[in-house]
Amino acid sequence: MTLIIDTASLIGGGILLLLVLAATLTDVFLRKSRRTENPLVAHEADKIKEMAEPSYDYPPVSIIVTPHDKAYELDQHLPLLLEQDYPAPFRIIVVFWRGESETDEVLKKYAANPHLYATYIPDSSRYMSRKKLAITVGEKAATTEWLLLTDVTCRPQSKYWLRAMARHATQERNLVIGHTRFDDDTPPFRRFLRSYTSLYLQQELARGTAYRCEGNALMLRRSEFEKRDGFRANLKYLRGEYDFIVNEYARPGATAFENSEDGTLLELCPTDKAWRNKLLYYMEDRRHMARTAAHRWRHNLAQTLLHLSVVALLASVLLGCLTARWILVAWAVLLLAATVGLRTWICLRALRSMDEDQPASRLFLYEMRLLWHYLAFHVRYHRANKDDFITHKI
């Protein structure tokens, strides 16, 4: 067997190397998540948690929860909110729909708790997003400057969750975004996608202005919510409550991101329908959000370079075998192995920084799957009736 080293092989090998390097340098996982520290540390001697950082001027907070036909989840997670260890006044405002008898029964169990306040929305309220209406009613019931929006399908991992979020509520800030992980019962690819998206948004926030909120915890100022007339600018869209708030309210240097262990929520595994709808509704919502083109270009570039490099490597192996350019074949195989190994290590390192446990053997395949996953949902979205994404048909 003759080893052929010709000009075409050298040029092709150089192009392959450049493609692999470019794909690696644009990998979202290359910059791992920067974790915020837990606000408290445990002392083994006396089992008492004390402040490990300078004292914070914790503000009074109203936590708004908007369950709809989720009495079981409310019963499981409401006690975790009511038992938060927080040095300032706080109140849990639960907004539910009149006629939800199971939710009403759950609230009666905790009615004696001074931190709980419940109100309802009449059945006659129509023609707008249930969630947006419930949040607006909760805001009207609040008496504090800082509001904390969260979902009943999520639970705090610690009784110091509220401390972790509220320590960022300083004079110069107007938004605090909290990280949310899926629980271990959630399929691995969904957990991978949540981590990928959250990390991408963190990096975007670090470079300037937050684009949207992927998680289920968002702090904002009540005065600003009222000044901007709440959801008036996006009232007709059924979903995207947190996304629209962040997209409209965020400004450089005024948004904090909380992702410590204490400050991270754990979300129950969503149903297949809820999972599909979340992405489909986001595809509609982003058409009406600012900075969408700037938000998408890094993801599109990274995915394009990844797939282009893999296709080029596989094509080089095939072409080299057909033309007996065995040096080119060996070089392409080496670069392909290096790509898989290096990207797996980079991804595993980033996921571990987010407390996300994934099998290393699947990570490269998950990265490759992202493009096809989004393309499949693009097809679903373009086939969907666009009136399904709004509250009043136009």
Identify what each model region corresponds to.
Residues P59-S62, R91:
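Cell-envelope/extracellular polymer assembly enzymes that use nucleotide-activated donors
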Residues I135, L147:
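Short aromatic/hydrophobic "clamp" motif used to bind/position activated sugar donors
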Residues D151-R167:
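Acidic donor-binding/catalytic loop of UDP-sugar-dependent glycosyltransferases
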Residues M1-A52, C347, Y374:
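N-terminal membrane-anchoring/stem segments of glycan-assembly enzymes
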Residues P79-S125:
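Acidic donor-binding segment of Leloir-type glycosyltransferases
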